[in-house]
């Protein structure tokens, strides 16, 4: 009976979640301008540069009632299309690569958070 109640609640709320996610005031998942810093321990200077990153709202759902169903994956705003650009760190000694590459968001989408390329906010098993 509890499973049926949870399913019924989900079916009732799903259309309102879809409707609410199409509202004109919500911050969409989209590329936005950002200023980042680049550094290398072997180089004396840290520089800042501008790029575009993915940011904004992705519709999500959290179950209020305990359910026997598995947890619902929460989508995040992530890269859909991107290219890489580079900046040169000044003053690096010979033998040290002065180039730092970074992603530039061309388009974004709501999708699963991939631990292989993103910081998803939880514990990591390996460094990026």
Curated annotation (Swiss-Prot):
InterPro entries: Cystine-knot_cytokine, Glyco_hormone_CN, Gonadotropin_bsu, Gonadotropin_bsu_CS
Protein name: Lutropin subunit beta
Function: Promotes spermatogenesis and ovulation by stimulating the testes and ovaries to synthesize steroids.
Pfam entry (one): Cys_knot
GO annotation, cellular component aspect: cytoplasm; extracellular space
UniProt organism field: Phodopus sungorus (Striped hairy-footed hamster)
GO molecular function, one term: hormone activity
High-level lineage: Eukaryota, Metazoa, Chordata, Craniata, Vertebrata
Superkingdom to which the source organism belongs: Eukaryota
Coarse class of the protein's main subcellular location: secreted
Entries under CDD domains matching the protein: GHB_like
Residues the record marks as carrying a glycan: 33
Disulfide bonds, paired cysteine numbers: 29-77, 43-92, 54-108, 58-110, 113-120
Family: Belongs to the glycoprotein hormones subunit beta family.
Keyword entries, A-Z: Disulfide bond, Glycoprotein, Hormone, Secreted, Signal
GO biological process, one term: G protein-coupled receptor signaling pathway
Signal peptide, first to last residue: 1-20
Location of this chain's protein in the cell: Secreted
Gene behind the chain: LHB
Subunit structure of this chain's protein: Heterodimer of a common alpha chain and a unique beta chain which confers biological specificity to thyrotropin, lutropin, follitropin and gonadotropin.
């Amino acid at each position: 009976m509890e499973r049926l109640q949870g399913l019924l609640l989900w079916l009732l709320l799903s259309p309102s979640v879809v409707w609410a996610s199409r509202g004109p005031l919500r911050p969409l998942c989209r590329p936005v301008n950002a200023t980042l810093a680049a550094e290398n321990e072997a180089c004396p200077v840290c520089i800042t540069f501008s790029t575009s990153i993915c940011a904004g709202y992705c519709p999500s759902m959290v179950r209020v009632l305990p359910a026997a169903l598995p947890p619902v994956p929460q989508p995040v705003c992530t890269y859909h299309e991107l290219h890489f650009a580079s900046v040169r760190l000044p003053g690096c000694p010979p033998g040290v690569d002065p180039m730092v590459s970074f992603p530039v968001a061309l388009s974004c989408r709501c999708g699963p958070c991939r631990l292989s390329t993103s910081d998803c906010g939880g514990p990591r098993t390996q460094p990026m």
